Amino acid sequence: MKIAIIGTGGVGGYFGARLLEAGFDVSFLARGEHLEAIKKNGIQLKSLLGDIQTKPCKASDKISDLGVSDVLIIGVKAWQIKEIRTELQSIMHKDSIVLPLQNGVMAADELSETIDKQHIVGGLCRIVSMITAPGCIAHTGVTPTIVFGELDHTISTRLQNLQENFKKANIHCQLSTNIETEIWKKFLLICISGLMAVTRCTYGEMNEVELTRQMMFKLLEEIYAVGIAKGIQYEPDIVARTVASFDALPYNTTFSLTRDVWEGKPSELEYQNGTVVHIGKQVKVPTPINEFIYTSLLPLEKKARTY
C-alpha cells in the first residue's frame, strides 16, 4: 500500500512516521526547513508510546511529486483544504481513498467539490502533537487514534483493509457506521481552543476560574444545540462527558488553534467557532458565547493573514 501524507505537521508527521516505521511506502508533503530535515534525516518522533527515528523520507513541497497513491491522508489545516484539493487528483487512481483528518465538520464536503465523492471517507483523529523543531514531532497527550468511516454509513471491504494496515503500524483506529456524528463529537471537543486563545490560558489555568469554566459549559451547550438541530445523534450527557475528558488532560494542554493565535499565525477560527456561528444562524440556534469568541479573535486572524 502506497500512502501519501498531505501535510507533515503534528498529525501527519506522527501517523506518517508510524506507517513508515512499519514498512509501508510513505511519501510526505512538507515545506521549508522541516522538509529538508525529513528528506535528509527522516522524522524524529518523541512519543508517550515510544520514540522512533525513521529513515530519510520521500518528501516534497509539491503534491504531484509524491506519486500516485492508494491512500491520501490529509493532514493540512482545515482552511488549506481549498488550496490543495484540485492538486490531489494528480496522485490519485480510480480506487484511491482520500482520508481527511481535519478539525471541524467541513472537510469532506469541501473535498467533494473537486473530487468524486466515491474516493472520500469521513475521518478524524485524536492526538496532542506538534512540530518542535525541523524534522521533529512531539506526541504529548491522548492515545493517538484515527476514527473513520464511509459517508454512506456502510462497512466496506476497502476500509476494513485500511483498518488492518493501520493496526500493523500500531495505530489505534476505529471504523464507524456514523462518522458524521463522530466528527461532530470531536467538534464539540475542539472548539474550546478558541476560549483558551481569548483567555491566553492553558486548559488547566482556565479551568481554575469558575466563571470561565461555566462559560466553557455554555460554549459546549451551544454546539450541542446546533448539532441536534442539524440532526446529529448526540447523547444527552455528551457535554458532561466531554468536560470530564478535558479534566483528564495535562494541566498545560493547549490545542493547535490556541497556539496559532498566540503565535500570530493563521488559524482554524473560521472552521471552529466561526462554523458554530454560521451553522447556528442557518438552523436558527443562538450561539452568543461562540459568537463572542469568533468576533473577538477575528481582528487577530485578519492580522495574521495580512503578513
What are these regions (language model features)?
Residues 17, 21, 86-90, 113, ...:
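Short, well-ordered alpha-helices that flank and scaffold nucleotide-derived cofactor binding pockets
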Residues 33, 79-80, 105-106, 154, ...:
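Short alpha-helical
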Residues 37, 90-91, 114-119, 134-186, ...:
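Internal alpha-helical scaffold of NAD(P)-dependent oxidoreductase catalytic cores
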Residues 52-136:
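Rossmann-like NAD(P)(H) cofactor-binding subdomain of soluble oxidoreductases
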Residues 1-51:
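NAD(P)+-binding Rossmann beta1-loop-alpha1 motif at the extreme N-terminus of oxidoreductases
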Residues 164, 217-307:
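NAD(P)-dependent Rossmann-like dehydrogenase/reductase catalytic/cofactor-binding core
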